[in-house]
Amino acid sequence: MVALMIGETGFFQKVFRAFPNSFTEMLSTQFEHSEWHGLTFWDVILPAFMTMAGTAMALSYKKQRDSGYTWKQSFLKVLKRSFWLLFLGILIYSVRDGHLNWQLSNVLTQLAFTTLIAFSVINQPVWFQFTVTILCLLIPEILYRSIHIPGFDQPFVEFHNFGSYINKSLGIHVDILHKTNFINFISSGAHTTWGLMAGQLLFSDKTSNRKFIYLLSAGVLFISTGLALDLTSITPMLKWISTSSFVLVTGGITLIVLGICYEWIDVRNHKNRLKFFTIVGMNSIFIYLFFIFIGDKWLNGYMEILCSELLNFANVPLAAGAAISCIIVFLMEWYLCYYLYKKKIFFKL
């Protein structure tokens, strides 16, 4: 969430404009989505968010069961949460570029559906859960490759694939900057379900060493399989339509990071060193809505003008002032999370 928060200010792009060199260009590129084929750091954020949501679901469900909740009661809570995720996901992008925008492909709307997929198998054995994730990957592959609609019969070409046809049929606004397909939630369901499985593993009675090995092994296997699919041109790695190779690689990366974090934080007990990050994570939904609703639409631009113009009086270049404004916005947003943390105010769906 901290990376997402700093990235949403446009900090790395503004640093590149202020200090153009190969290093800042690399950072700027990594904090932008790939144009079509390939993978950047920024592309991994959404899959990581969805995977961690599955892990959090495992913890929440365990606490509910310990408190005497039935499956039906837990399901109703999940259903309510999915409704609010869907509502907020539509609301935050309902007005864009000066007109109404019907959007069903951002992280909140996608998570609304993947949450239901993961919860549907929460009481099933591991082999069944894993089989469902494989189906999540195979179903889009079959749909994209086997359905041939004139103008939408090229499975891995932007705007000419089956997912684009569904977008058009539903009246979803798509352009060169916003070309994510609604049906991505099918393959992304694997992310949230893998997160659920990882969470159940972490809360099991297996040894910490075995948990660490399982997470790393699964991560390496997923990355290897995804890269093989991409490098052999069987299925290219495409973030925008969430191909199976993309889901496997990003899911694998997230599981490895989760395993390393578990080993370093929980097993080796370094929890106190991460307070800066956990303060943001404890209000992740709130701060996400804040920097989309307020940051993107007003605060970022306002602070850029204010800082760059004022600092220019001290002979600081406008581009450098714009980069500094991003740091100020980031610190303001972090302090807002800190204030909520100190007041014990946590926004949950």
Specify the residue positions occupied by each region the protein language model found.
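Alpha-helical transmembrane segments and their immediate juxtamembrane cytosolic regions
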Residues: M1-L349
